[in-house]
Amino acid sequence: MSETSEANILKGMLAGAVGGLVASWTMNVFQKAWAAAEKQITGGKQGQPGDQKGGEDAEDATMKTADRISEVLQGRHLTRDEKKKAGPVVHYAFGAIMGAVYGASVEVNPAANAMAGIPFGAILFAAADEVALPALGLSDKPAAYPLSTHLYGLVSHAVYGVTTETVRRIVRG
């Protein structure tokens, strides 16, 4: 690999990481808007699709991941407050890392940015939410959730993918 192509891959990774960070924030905003709209439509009768277990005390996958990382690295579980603080760190770190992978992929194969990043978001949803998290015991198996939860996750990740690609393209120039 030439120095020029290595430099381009690094630039792509950096642009993708920035895109992934912005996209992680945008995804959070989208999910809050979805939950508010659902609450208004249903009169608050249904739980939020993102709260796969439901309720204020439910631990999401990022909190469980943070706890698992702490257990491996520090030999101890996190407290509830520590999980609440560490969960977003996991979310944004994962978003940045996946954005960096995406940015490098686009440098190697420009067709990877097809359809403005929607396929990237959809693949990430399938790989993370539907396969990796259940396999690692960080969420229930996909069959345990209603179709609306899967749709919520897919659309949320499509928002992440489009935002990652948009920001990556702007940063990369």
Predicted feature locations:
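Short amphipathic, positively biased membrane-proximal segments
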Residues: 1-173
